[in-house]
Amino acid sequence: MVKMIVGLGNPGSKYEKTKHNIGFMAIDNIVKNLDVTFTDDKNFKAQIGSTFINHEKVYFVKPTTFMNNSGIAVKALLTYYNIDITDLIVIYDDLDMEVSKLRLRSKGSAGGHNGIKSIIAHIGTQEFNRIKVGIGRPLKGMTVISHVMGQFNTEDNIAISLTLDRVVNAVKFYLQENDFEKTMQKFNG
């Protein structure tokens, strides 16, 4: 079996620490203690790293298509490596959840998230595993774009750091148990 863990975000240093890049941050945290080196693959339009965990090949992916076209990279990789949709997890930000809240789902709509809209459009289904990290709603008078492209304040940064640790633990648990339902039961909340 082959697994693929995708973190959504935008490429480039100017977006590196923005709320919208929580998926990239999660991938970086997951691979921190693994022997994974990323390569910038122009064919797949993604940064890709891989390793074996429990005798299974696991790909860690950060699409370089910019958020709104993430589905291009995800579809290309699923097809090329013949990865089953049930072996895909997508990690991304959710502004409809409080900062640092974590929610795991095995299906659902895009909920207004353009990266998820793109993935659904390209793979043709809403039924794929996802880990949503809350980034909160914009403050009064602030646009959604300026909110998601902004950085976390000091207080939220601490909370997000702890949440990213939970994301790492959830992904490790999933890779160990090979059961997303069980992972949802353990880590939702």
Curated annotation (Swiss-Prot):
Coiled coil: none annotated. One of its GO terms (molecular function) is tRNA binding. TRNA binds at Y15, F66, N68, N114. SUPFAM superfamilies: Peptidyl-tRNA hydrolase-like. GO terms for biological process: protein quality control for misfolded or incompletely synthesized proteins; rescue of stalled ribosome. GO terms for cellular component: cytoplasm. The keyword RNA-binding applies. It catalyses: an N-acyl-L-alpha-aminoacyl-tRNA + H2O = an N-acyl-L-amino acid + a tRNA + H(+). Keywords: Cytoplasm, Hydrolase, RNA-binding, tRNA-binding. It is found in: Cytoplasm. Gene3D superfamilies: Peptidyl-tRNA hydrolase. It holds the Pfam family Pept_tRNA_hydro. The keyword Oxidoreductase does not apply. PROSITE patterns: PEPT_TRNA_HYDROL_1, PEPT_TRNA_HYDROL_2. The record marks N10 as: Discriminates between blocked and unblocked aminoacyl-tRNA. The active site is at H20 (proton acceptor). Its EC number is 3.1.1.29. NCBIfam families: pth. Hydrolyzes ribosome-free peptidyl-tRNAs (with 1 or more amino acids incorporated), which drop off the ribosome during protein synthesis, or as a result of ribosome stalling. Catalyzes the release of premature peptidyl moieties from peptidyl-tRNA molecules trapped in stalled 50S ribosomal subunits, and thus maintains levels of free tRNAs and 50S ribosomes. This is Peptidyl-tRNA hydrolase. It comes from Streptococcus pyogenes serotype M5 (strain Manfredo). The gene is pth.
